[in-house]
């Protein structure tokens, strides 16, 4: 294998945000992504390295976590910015249009996907338009993804088996902790999804389960597993596209037990317009003074500058996240 056999891709994202809140400081964050794929006769290697700057402890992303899904993507055990290998996996090309990916994976990339609301670097910046708030995804973790491509008689199927805790979920944020699979506090994340993909429309439904125990609200020792269902509808025609998301989770242990989101995108001569609104509902057993349902909304306009590889994206958001 030579350097010519490796396909490289990457990008840099810088975000400046100011909030209409005297208690919150303006914040500048930055991140970088580098992908390397190596094609082999039986499959493909994928490596993903990402880095992010240190967040401002009094900045916008600290007080309003959903408004910048690109912030805090890589943190050290002390809470500072860092660099890490987030994906390192191999995809086997199996017979009958099937693939099997194993290694260090991103579970959220395989469930609850949308054509216009899934990537904070080139689409909506607000995290509520990247993934469903009710799905308790692990961070980058060890696991496997079996994908069965669809055809005219069946939908595309995705099956996931992964660790319940990823790098950012662990106290030391280390690969050594990630490999410690004997911890009593850990379990597995199971996910299944079905997708019907057409030229103009797409339908996705799925279910997920975490086997690690969560303490039921109001109890000190009674536990249950968190689980849920999700659905995504997509539509596109000409310059217009629409994305609708919903989800439910176990209200006994999940703070966010219901979610609904709507996103719209329109291509114009000058750039890409996006408008979205999402509502995250708090479970009744977790509701208390100062904690209530959350609202996220965003309008952005992505403008290419000096070609198609550079963009400037003004974004206005209105959020309410009491107690989240």
PLM regions with names:
Residues 47, 275, 288-291, 295-324:
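Predominantly the C-terminal beta-signal and adjacent terminal strand-loop region
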Residues 16-18, 24-32, 81-86, 138-142, ...:
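Residues that define the transmembrane beta-barrel architecture of outer-membrane proteins
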Residues 2-21, 43-47, 55, 122-123, ...:
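Transmembrane beta-strand segments of Gram-negative outer membrane beta-barrel proteins
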Residues 29-164, 254-261, 267, 272-285:
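Outer membrane beta-barrel
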Residues 11-17, 50-54, 105-107, 160-164, ...:
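Outer-membrane beta-barrel pore domains and translocons
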Residues 146, 158-215:
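Membrane-embedded hairpin module used as a gating/binding unit in multi-pass transport
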